[in-house]
């Protein structure tokens, strides 16, 4: 597989440091508010990427962090708790971390290898800062804050393709109090009365954002690891500063081989943001659409390009999801009607080949999703009509390939139906088949209507009848 590496601005063959082991880190949320569909795009992409690697035989160690102490969290605590904020601020990140896990489950995102929190790793961060000060890459300000000195690192700006001179020209003429250079950034922030704090050799305070991710990623994955990812808005300054810190601490040019970034989510051409009032939370979206619909909607845009969010796209994706389930349900039943040998060749292999070819070319999910959906429609329009002309082995092979493709996209995650429901529906369908043979069509139609009322749709193919479930109804 070739993947675009932001660090080199090139498509590169994806090769891990350890064969069949992929180690990756994705910057997680700052849990001060509800996760929105823009967050969902990032984590669904890396979930699909992880699923693809696992399908290729890799063990994947994916780490996602939580920045569970931050100015935004402190401000939200003050809004909610007033004078009690100092004691109750942890309730804010705990609430939104719980929501993150709930929404991840509803989006069928597989659990990460680890979910480190900043507040659980402060001691390690203090240790890093000590080392950076000793090496001459960091300095202490009069108020006790500690800053990283950007000018001490060769080739600063390598990830974002910016020269330090150009960055300086765009920065403030006078640095903030305590800074030697406007581009220098905080490794340790001094305590402000009323805010949470931790002990350090310099002053009570808390870690800086850029330090946090590099400490937690390397703690869980080692140095160097295979890929580091996040939204495109993190390229500068966050990921640029992570590289600078790691270069100073470890003496390596790049502590991750591939830097993978996901494009913005837009609404009517504008970036989704709280300041513009155009944010759609995942809870809101998932109250109207299935997790598979959101995954398919994300897949229809290439990960590196901006994605225009609209309910029209989600409507289309929901219909695609229904078709995908129909193909699965009915082909699973049709296997029993297949013959002993192939009397007719079916051209389903091209969908499979082009699906994987698309993913191998910079993980092009729009083309992959198109091929997978094409196979679903081919199953319904052709395979089911010719099931008696192909062998059971061929039918099972088609079903197996279909499920493998679906598992990479994560769009057949509700395929299991309770056994007692399956048996009851099957019995009703058998009774209806007898009624049709006896030409008792009014009673047969009555059974069809009653089944439809509980979310079971019947499709007749001559004398054969297959059924599919409308997921999300009371059957589930």
From Swiss-Prot:
Which GO BP terms apply? cysteinyl-tRNA aminoacylation
Q: Which InterPro entries does its entry note?
A: Cys-tRNA-ligase, Cys-tRNA-synt_Ia_DALR, Cys-tRNA/MSH_ligase, Rossmann-like_a/b/a_fold, tRNA-synt_1_cat_dom, tRNAsynth_Ia_anticodon-bd
Q: Write down the required cofactor(s).
A: Zn(2+)
Q: In which residues does the motif 'KMSKS' region occur? A: 271-275
Q: Where, in this chain's numbering, is ATP bound?
A: 274
Task: Provide the disulphide bond pattern.
Answer: none
Record GO terms (molecular function): ATP binding; cysteine-tRNA ligase activity; zinc ion binding
'HIGH' region, short sequence motif: residues: 29-39
Compartments where found: Cytoplasm
The protein's matches in Pfam families, at most eight in alphabetical order, are given as:
DALR_2 (PF09190), tRNA-synt_1e (PF01406)
Q: Sorted alphabetically, which keywords does the UniProt record give? A: Aminoacyl-tRNA synthetase, ATP-binding, Cytoplasm, Ligase, Metal-binding, Nucleotide-binding, Protein biosynthesis, Zinc
> CDD domains annotated for this entry?
CysRS_core
Enzyme Commission designation = 6.1.1.16
In which residues is Zn(2+) bound? Answer: 27, 213, 238, 242
What the record notes about the co-factor is: Binds 1 zinc ion per subunit.
Primary site of residence: cytoplasm
Per its UniProt record, what NCBIfam families does this chain match? cysS
Q: Which protein family is named in the record?
A: Belongs to the class-I aminoacyl-tRNA synthetase family.
Write down what this protein is called: Cysteine--tRNA ligase
Q: Taxonomic lineage of this organism?
A: Archaea, Thermoproteota, Thermoprotei, Thermoproteales, Thermoproteaceae
Q: Which gene encodes it?
A: cysS
